[in-house]
Amino acid sequence: VLNKKTGEMETKPIVDLIMPSSKIEAVKEFINDNPDKKFVVFSASKKACYLAQAEFTSHGITAEVLSGDTKDSARREMVNRFVQGEFRVFIAVIEAAAEGIDGLQHATDTAIFLDRSWKTIKNKQAEDRLHRGGQKDTVLIIDVMARDSLDFGRHQRLQEKWAWIKAVLGDPGTAQKMITSGKDIAA
């Protein structure tokens, strides 16, 4: 890879997401086991979102992806179509859906995280797409991860970070205000 600042070539490890993915397979199986439900699936990776969509649709599960590339005008339309049942799985990049998306709570009570963002607040905001006025059921949040993996370690680190935020702020109400304002602290 060419370093644009120095003009020198650098060696960087490349992680390429490919199918099959055991995490996407597990989510697909869970969705198939619950044929009368709709789901929101989150990932920090746009590529993982599109891989999940391709896998789901190839097995008859209707799914659409919301990413940072989705125009504002299309976001509201996508949510409306999901609520109306035009597709079963709303797949979203965490950073793109954490703020400014409302209405998902009218369609489902289940969010599945293929992975989490390193930004604690963005994860909480993504979860809160379902924890909103109009939600009639208990919300189920599912994290797909393997023990002793990067995902497992990230999950533990994010839990520690969230506990620290609550301790520093002194009360859960203040932490909630921080979430809704969109402020985050560095990792």
What is the meaning of each model-derived region?
Residues 1-103, 172-187:
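Conserved Helicase C-terminal RecA-like lobe
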Residues 36-38, 108, 138:
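A general structural motif
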Residues 44, 68, 116, 144-146:
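Cofactor-binding loop segments of dinucleotide-utilizing enzymes, especially the Rossmann-like FAD-
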Residues 52-54, 102-106, 124-125, 155-156:
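Short amphipathic alpha-helical segments
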Residues 84, 106, 132-135:
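Solvent-exposed polar/charged
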Residues 90, 110-111, 130:
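Short, well-ordered beta-strand core segments
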Residues 102-116, 140-143:
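A short beta-strand element within the Helicase C-terminal
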Residues 118-187:
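A conserved SF2-helicase RecA2
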